[in-house]
Structure formats: structure tokens, C-alpha cells
């Protein structure tokens, strides 16, 4: 989220530095990630990018920065790249494929994020493991393939059971984190 941390992570040899919307909870003191804005994210991406890391800087697109229109999605993704991100990450499954494609159309690489998606914390019933029940596990697996097929170069699997993560990893051609 900041230059000192970025220097440490880069020196440790990390392949990427995710400047996450979790900055809302970790640094800014909010109870969830819904309060962080695109302006906040630009600020933190720029702080990390100014260290000129060899690690890929991933700018997390906050809630409502890619939910309203294609134009907003493109403008917000481009603003994170202008701040120094090499790519962007956005949450959600099949219903976010259009947003992924809009960003890829302007040649910005996209990382996906499924499972526990903190921007949907209220819809998911809180911060808890997703996919423990069979139907929920199927939904997560079904969300992974369209994201990979849409062009995401990697997909974050957050708070899903090991078996579900294995199924997803085995069913798509892109790396899972």
C-alpha cells in the first residue's frame, strides 16, 4: 500500500505486488473494502509504483469503479495504469466478463478474483469461506471458466476449500493464486 512496504516486497523477490482495496481495512480503518475509492487506489498504486519495483504492480479496482458503465470501467482502469499499475484486478465471476473485455479492449491486462469477494461481503453474508456446499462450489467453478476464457491472465481464489481450488486450477489454463 506504500513505498516502504513495496521496497521490502520487491527486494524479497515477489513476482507481483497487489495494491489491494483491502487498504480500506488495513490502513484506512474502515470495517470493509466498500469505502475505498478509485482516488484512494490511485494514490496507493502511485506510492508503490514510485519505488520502481521489478515486481508487477497490480492495481485493485474498488467497488463501483467497474459496476456502472463500460466508460467508467475503462476510465478507472486506465487511471490505475497511469498511476503506475501494470495491470488491474477485479472481483466477480460471469457477470463481470463484459468489464474484463472492456479493459482488455484498451490493452490493459486483467487479473480475476472469485470465491470470497470482499466487495460483495453483504451479499455473501459476511467474510467467510465460500463454496463449502456443493451448489456454492459449483457456482464458483462455473465462474472461473468464463473469466479465464474472457482473457484474465490469472485468477485469485480467495477463501475457497482446497478441493474447490484444485477443481478450478485443473479446469482453466491460467494460473490461480
Question: Would you name each region that the model predicts?
Answer:
Residues 1-177:
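Alpha/beta enzyme core
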Amino acid at each position: 500500500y506504500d513505498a516502504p512496504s513495496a521496497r521490502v516486497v520487491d527486494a524479497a523477490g515477489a513476482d507481483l505486488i497487489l495494491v489491494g482495496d483491502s487498504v480500506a481495512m488495513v490502513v484506512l480503518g474502515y470495517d470493509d473494502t466498500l469505502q475505498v475509492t478509485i482516488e484512494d487506489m490511485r494514490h496507493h498504486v502511485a506510492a508503490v509504483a514510485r519505488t520502481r519495483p521489478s515486481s508487477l504492480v497490480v492495481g485493485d479496482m474498488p467497488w463501483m469503479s467497474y459496476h456502472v458503465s463500460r466508460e467508467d470501467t475503462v476510465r478507472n482502469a486506465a487511471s490505475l495504469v497511469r498511476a503506475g499499475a501494470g495491470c488491474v484486478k477485479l472481483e466477480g465471476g460471469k457477470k463481470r466478463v463484459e468489464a474484463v473485455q472492456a479493459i482488455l479492449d484498451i490493452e490493459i491486462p486483467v487479473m480475476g478474483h472469485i470465491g470470497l469477494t470482499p466487495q460483495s461481503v453483504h451479499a455473501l453474508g459476511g467474510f467467510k469461506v465460500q463454496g463449502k456446499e456443493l451448489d456454492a462450489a459449483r457456482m464458483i467453478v462455473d465462474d472461473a471458466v468464463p473469466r479465464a476464457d474472457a482473457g484474465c491472465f490469472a485468477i485469485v481464489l480467495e477463501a475457497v476449500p482446497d478441493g474447490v481450488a484444485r477443481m478450478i486450477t485443473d479446469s482453466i489454463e491460467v494460473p490461480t493464486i
